């Protein structure tokens, strides 16, 4: 029934037997929490130092302990995979330390810390430093900014409900996606500030009676916010994990929205863009196919990221304070989200950076679908016509065009006059795409002058983002 192959367990004494093989298999997490190993080593070094300051390790013991810990980094992967009998990464690493230092010295490292505060701390450390999501997002934004800068005057049909709405600059549209990604990066920075609090010293839930200094550990491990102010919350809270999962899911959603547009733009019917051969795939049976697989995988992976978030929230929703073993299930979804973004973002960036934009096709469709109707209404308002009347008059112009099978700029002066006495020949000044674009020069608008301001602001924000990402790495 039971299994005990000489492996180290961090609990025992009151147990006469066990654990059963079935329980050991269920409990094992070393196959995924191995990625916390470098942070476990760093945490153990910091813990050894506070044990020394508290008089629980002599100077000689501290020196030997740190020397033993120094030997871990080159061999921790081999150590972790030597046996699956270890319950988790922390057990595996402690086993290795005991083997090298002996039970008398190696066994002292466990004093004053529980896996509860240990895991909560290491998980924060991992998420704060890997996989460099902010830097990868910034690289995608750089590619989008480059796309906008390469096509500053290209007009395209702006859409609502996927129907022609008003002409906009292609650069304006692209920068809208950059803005959304900037908020994702900003969320990461804000999340990091909230997560920069160390649970070390919280123990299992009630804190420590050994005179250890949690503030020293927090400083040693780079937690700018110091140590947790409540030991129960320090060990039991996983809102930082849920928030990180939301940020990754939101980033995935923002990628998916852009991906959907690229897929549509790449169709024969739209022909707005062409994908580079290096960032598209073919068909096993149809030789003419050139498929937008990266964009499609971005859509698919966004669902996966959302699933990781919702699964995590379902795990957390009914946990009483403090720690519960359910929290072992908090890591795999977020590890997966990190991995998915790490592989998706570089490919997506390459796809964007190598897009060929077809200006002629975009500008051909920019005025189509009566997209200048709003300009007629606003021109009338500037002539003193109440907007509701102006709206009706512009709608009547569209109706006339639909009946005649023409576009708004093709209406004659006589037809305009027949629709409304307010429609003088001067209305033609707004019936050009360039005129419509130039008129929307308020902050955030699509006029070239307004888009230039947006571009400058985005680039300034990107400089901040790159600096923060460099600190992150």
From Swiss-Prot:
Catalytic activity, reaction form: 2-(N(omega)-L-arginino)succinate = fumarate + L-arginine
GO biological process: arginine biosynthetic process via ornithine; L-arginine biosynthetic process
Subcellular location: Cytoplasm
Pathway assignment: Amino-acid biosynthesis; L-arginine biosynthesis; L-arginine from L-ornithine and carbamoyl phosphate: step 3/3
Primary localization class, coarse: cytoplasm
Enzyme class: lyase
Similarity annotation: Belongs to the lyase 1 family. Argininosuccinate lyase subfamily.
PANTHER family xref list: ARGININOSUCCINATE LYASE
Protein name as catalogued: Argininosuccinate lyase
Protein source organism: Streptomyces clavuligerus
Record gene name: argH
